[in-house]
Amino acid sequence: MNRLIELTGWIVLVVSVILLGVASHIDNYQPPEQSASVQHK
């Protein structure tokens, strides 16, 4: 049981870090598109 708990804890940490990385990349990519659309208008 302890190993299962440790594995689930590590999996949750890895998934959360990956989600944070993806979210940060999405946040970084969105602003240029919005600014470009505003400039075209």
Swiss-Prot record:
Which cellular component terms (GO) are annotated to the entry? division septum; membrane; plasma membrane
Signal peptide start and end residues: none
The protein's predominant localisation is membrane
Q: What happens when the gene is disrupted?
A: Inactivation increases the susceptibility of bacteria to a number of antibiotics that inhibit peptidoglycan biosynthesis. Increases the susceptibility to cycloserine, bacitracin, and a wide spectrum of beta-lactam antibiotics. Does not affect susceptibility to fosfomycin, valinomycin, tetracycline, chloramphenicol, gentamicin or quinolones.
Q: What is the lineage of its organism?
A: Bacteria, Pseudomonadati, Pseudomonadota, Gammaproteobacteria, Enterobacterales
The record's function comment reads: Component of the cell division machinery, which is probably involved in the stabilization of the divisome under certain stress conditions.
- What is this protein's record name? Divisome-associated membrane protein Blr
Residue intervals on the Cytoplasmic side: 1-3
What is the topology of this protein in the membrane according to its UniProt annotation? Single-pass membrane protein
- List residues traversing the bilayer: 4-24
Kindly list the places in or outside the cell where this protein is found, as annotated in its UniProt entry: Cell inner membrane
The residues exposed to the Periplasmic compartment are 25-41
Q: Which domain of life is it from?
A: Bacteria
Q: Which organism is it from?
A: Escherichia coli (strain K12)
Keywords attached to this Swiss-Prot or TrEMBL record, sorted alphabetically, are:
Antibiotic resistance, Cell cycle, Cell division, Cell inner membrane, Cell membrane, Membrane, Stress response, Transmembrane, Transmembrane helix
